[in-house]
């Protein structure tokens, strides 16, 4: 104790104490300043400011004032700008009321500028997938072999839910896998990377961009296939032809077989 008392009386004690205090303040600031800088960027970026205003009006009642989520909707922290661009670009969001699945083209239409602004704001809440550049999803220039490989990838990873030709199908609990017939290449890419609703996330480790391009090219080729009329049954053939083939054709053969059996029994 006498040693410490002697040290406190040393002429260098006060300057050293001051330096130690300044060092501690610097360490605390280095931890806090990134968050403060992020908040400052949010407050000064015009697009983010616009997006925050739109978010407060259209999204916060379900997703929370800070995107933290509520009992009605999930958190948006870390979903990224791509999720916003997909959900609002396909008019699945904002929902007017909770339901098992957000249907396409059910929400009010927003301009791309408004969608970009909300996406920019949501991107500040946490790191997530960004809106992709066209080079990431454009299938232009792919060979026939690459398109055929896209079909194999689609059948392996997607057809169990979306049907072999991307026509969609039913899922448990009132949900469904939507048709991919008229979905843009960008939105297909964003859906794979963000996993909307019941869909799993396919990150670049699971499906590299080249694989995604090949899948998109395969779906584009399916859309260009000629249609020969009739009510189609998910690419399995027109319903009308199937009806005649199975019900009338096979049914007729069964009736003929029964008639022949009865005729043979009478002859005996």
Which role fits each region the language model picked out?
Residues 26-34, 258-263:
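Short hydrophobic alpha-helical membrane-anchoring segments
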Residues 3-18, 47, 242-248:
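N-terminal export and membrane-targeting signals
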Residues 48-52, 64-108, 151, 163-205:
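Gly/Gly-Pro-rich "capping" loops immediately C-terminal to redox-active cysteine motifs
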Residues 14-31, 252-253:
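Hydrophobic membrane-insertion alpha-helices, especially the h-region
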Residues 29-53, 70, 127-153, 173:
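Electrostatic cytochrome c docking/interface patches
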Residues 1-6, 23, 27:
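Long, compositionally biased, intrinsically disordered
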Residues 2, 98-168, 185, 198-268:
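Flexible coil segments in periplasmic/lumen-exposed cytochrome c-class electron-transfer proteins
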């Amino acid at each position: 104790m006498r040693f410490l008392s002697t040290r406190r009386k040393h002429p260098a004690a006060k300057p050293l104490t001051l330096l130690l205090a300044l060092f501690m303040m610097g360490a605390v600031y280095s931890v806090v300043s990134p968050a403060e800088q992020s908040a400052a960027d949010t407050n000064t970026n015009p697009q983010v400011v616009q997006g925050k205003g739109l978010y407060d009006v259209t999204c916060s009642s379900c997703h929370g004032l800070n995107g933290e989520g509520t009992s009605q909707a999930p958190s948006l922290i870390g979903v990224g700008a791509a999720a916003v661009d997909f959900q609002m670009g396909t008019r699945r969001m904002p929902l007017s009321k909770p339901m098992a699945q957000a249907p396409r083209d059910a929400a009010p239409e927003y301009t791309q500028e408004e969608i970009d602004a909300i996406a920019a704001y949501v991107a500040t809440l946490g790191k997530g997938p960004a809106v992709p550049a066209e080079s990431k999803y454009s299938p232009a220039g792919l060979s026939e072999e690459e398109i055929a490989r896209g079909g194999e990838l689609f059948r392996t990873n997607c057809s169990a839910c979306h049907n072999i030709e991307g026509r969609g199908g039913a899922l448990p609990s009132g949900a469904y896998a939507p048709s991919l017939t008229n979905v843009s290449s960008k939105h297909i890419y964003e859906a794979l990377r963000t996993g909307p609703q019941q869909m799993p996330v396919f990150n670049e480790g699971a499906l590299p961009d080249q694989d995604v391009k090949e899948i998109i090219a395969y779906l584009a080729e399916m859309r260009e296939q000629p249609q020969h009329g009739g009510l189609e049954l998910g690419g399995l053939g027109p319903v009308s032809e199937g009806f005649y083939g199975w019900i009338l054709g096979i049914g007729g053969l069964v009736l003929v077989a029964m008639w022949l059996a009865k005729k043979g029994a009478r002859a005996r």
